[in-house]
Amino acid sequence: MLKFYLENVFHLIFFAKLPEAYAVSDPIVNVMPIIPLFFFLLAFVWQASVSFR
């Protein structure tokens, strides 16, 4: 029982500080969903550069 309680306390403390610890990377996380669109557009740029062969 004590082990279960200590594990829960550890997880609460660890995950409570996690968002604050990663606050620096918040702007990067906001841009990340757009990155696959760049690869999609890159395919068209590549095909345009080889004249859509």
Curated annotation (Swiss-Prot):
UniProt topology in membrane: Single-pass membrane protein
Top-rank taxon: Eukaryota
Pro-peptide positions on chain: 1-16
Biological process terms in GO annotation: photosynthesis
Keywords linked to the UniProt accession: Chloroplast, Membrane, Photosynthesis, Photosystem II, Plastid, Reaction center, Thylakoid, Transmembrane, Transmembrane helix
Pfam families the record matches: PsbK
Transmembrane segments: 28-48
Subcellular location: Plastid, Chloroplast thylakoid membrane
Subunit: PSII is composed of 1 copy each of membrane proteins PsbA, PsbB, PsbC, PsbD, PsbE, PsbF, PsbH, PsbI, PsbJ, PsbK, PsbL, PsbM, PsbT, PsbX, PsbY, PsbZ, Psb30/Ycf12, at least 3 peripheral proteins of the oxygen-evolving complex and a large number of cofactors. It forms dimeric complexes.
Protein family (similarity comment): Belongs to the PsbK family.
Role of this protein: One of the components of the core complex of photosystem II (PSII). PSII is a light-driven water:plastoquinone oxidoreductase that uses light energy to abstract electrons from H(2)O, generating O(2) and a proton gradient subsequently used for ATP formation. It consists of a core antenna complex that captures photons, and an electron transfer chain that converts photonic excitation into a charge separation.
Protein name according to UniProt: Photosystem II reaction center protein K
Organism of derivation: Huperzia lucidula
Gene coding for it: psbK
